[in-house]
């Protein structure tokens, strides 16, 4: 075809036919090279400042600023309640709350109001929307999610799980299957690196071992490995750090391999007033 007019007419006809056939408007946007760079994520404008956290045995949490704590440090608790755990943290920090129902609740400290020592604090089960009768077993400030959790079960087993297994990309608040349900959970511990721990049974016996003996798992619901060999009718009771036990002869209770029975707790090494760190 040599005529420019005829060429233009042919193109016009073809475009008209295409328009009739594909009448739906464009659903995507043309992106040019200068637009292809990923836009920076919006900056977190949540105020960040140091805070002190106080958790009671019955699950009440207080977030108190250092200034407020200096003015009044005597903590108020309900009758029959008392101090369980406390940390120093920052307002933007994440918080993981583990319960007795194999669940983990993820929240941020900025979701909690600053309070004073003279109040009871937030009731965590109510604040986080826990199931009826669900109780707090422990809390963790995950930071960059390095390190690992260790779960200690009534049957003498312990499960060492990478903390990164609890990191989520979504805003999911509740994680189910946070740990194994094969035996009741007696204690949990968050460690950045391996160290010695003292494991107590109800006999009472004590076994002091290094957590390096526990193999690390990536599956949250792993049953763990046998740690404490138990006689019938006895169970794993609690876990402490050796320096907090009041035991004078630590060598008596040390084990080089697992599982092990530990040694009977001497009267002079028993201290009912010692608080578990877990």
Go through each PLM region and give its residues.
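C-terminal interaction appendages of subunits in large macromolecular complexes
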Residues: 1-278
């Amino acid at each position: 075809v040599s005529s420019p007019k005829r060429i233009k007419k042919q193109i016009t006809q073809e475009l008209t036919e295409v328009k009739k056939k594909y009448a739906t408007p464009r659903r995507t946007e043309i992106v040019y090279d200068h637009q292809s760079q990923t836009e920076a994520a919006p900056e977190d404008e949540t105020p960040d400042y140091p805070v002190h956290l106080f958790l009671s045995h019955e699950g009440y949490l207080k977030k108190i600023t250092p200034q407020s704590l200096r003015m009044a440090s005597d903590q108020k608790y309900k009758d029959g309640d008392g101090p369980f755990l406390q940390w120093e943290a920052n307002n933007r920090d994440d918080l993981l709350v583990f319960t007795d129902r194999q669940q983990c609740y993820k929240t941020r400290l900025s979701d909690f109001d600053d309070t004073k020592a003279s109040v009871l604090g937030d009731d965590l089960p109510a604040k986080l929307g826990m199931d009826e009768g669900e109780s707090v077993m422990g809390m963790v400030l995950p930071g960059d999610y390095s390190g690992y959790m260790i779960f200690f079960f009534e049957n003498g087993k312990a499960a060492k799980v990478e903390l990164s297994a609890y990191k989520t990309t979504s805003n999911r608040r509740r994680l189910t299957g946070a740990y194994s349900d094969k035996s009741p959970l007696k204690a949990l511990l968050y460690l950045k690196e391996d160290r010695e721990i003292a494991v107590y049974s109800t006999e009472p016996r004590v076994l002091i071992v290094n957590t390096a003996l526990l193999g690390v798992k990536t599956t949250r619901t792993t049953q763990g490995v046998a740690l404490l060999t138990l006689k019938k009718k006895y169970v794993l009771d609690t876990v402490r750090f050796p320096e907090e036990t009041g035991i004078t002869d630590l060598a008596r209770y040390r084990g080089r391999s697992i599982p092990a029975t530990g040694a009977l707790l001497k009267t002079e090494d028993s201290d009912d007033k010692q608080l578990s760190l877990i």
